[in-house]
Amino acid sequence: MSVMAEVEATVKQLQTESNSLPQLTAELTTALDQWQKASLDITGRVMDDVDLVGACSVNYLMLCGTVLGGWLMAKSALVAMEKTSEDPDFYGAKIITAEFYAAHILPRAGAYATAATADSQLTMGLKEEQF
């Protein structure tokens, strides 16, 4: 199973099991969609644009890291919801941390996706001597 498919499985689990994490569910769903679309866009253009990989790499990696961080936070929150009664302070903190990530970090995925799929000539257009 690909990592993207694993994230998708977690999103489905959130959608079916977790009505108490609506923002995390919504933000991770959106971020996954942005990651998938950016990946398809980049792979669809890379053979015709030799500069694309260099131009998009930083923002694409930031997109990947942001989405994967959200995925791991979601997995942690799902486990924490099951175990809250064992240690309410510890597992409650896990849930709050995941909600924070959803509210403050996951929304950045959209900006990274936009930047990663921008025209490579905007990044690579300067000649070496212009630096």
Feature roles, as predicted:
Residues 1:
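Gly/Pro-rich active-site capping loops and adjacent beta-alpha segments
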Residues 4-131:
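C-terminal amphipathic alpha-helical interaction region
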